[in-house]
Amino acid sequence: SRIIISPGPGTPEQDSGVSNDVIRHFYKTTPILGVCLGQQCMGHVFGGTVTRAPRLMHGKVSPVYHTGKGVFYGLPSPFQATRYHSLIVQEPLPPELELTAFTMEGEVMGLRHREYPCIGVQFHPESILTEHGKDILRNFLTMSR
C-alpha cells in the first residue's frame, strides 16, 4: 500500500486536517508522497520551517531541477512543472530530510526522508502541464520500501 497526501489551501500548522498525524504514524512503515501542502506538512512534521515563497505561483509553469533520486529517477533535469502555491519549505532542511528538487532561484521543490520512504514535491505531478508527471507517480508506486 501507499499514501498520497494531496494539496489544499492553508498552512500545515493549521489547515492540514489529519495529514500531519498520518505522516507521524506511517512514515516508517508505508511509502508516503506529499504533494504541495503534503510536502509542507512533511517539512513541518520533521521540524522544518514553512514560509512564504518569494513569488506566488498559482497555475504557473517553471523549470524544476533534481538529483535523479527516488521519484525523479530516469527523468531529465530540468523539466517543466506546474506550481500552485504561496508557501514553501525553507532551507536549511531538518537533518532527517534531504533536498531532491529545486528551482534555479533555490526554492525547495522536492525532499525526502534520508531513511524512510517519505517523499515530497512542491509542484503538481498530476497537472497536465507538468512534464513527466506520470513518470514521477509511476516511480513512487513502484519504489520499494
Regions found by a protein language model. Give the residues of each.
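Acyltransferase
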Residues: 128-145
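Flexible gly/pro-rich beta->alpha loop and the following alpha-helix that scaffold active-site loops
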Residues: 1-34, 46
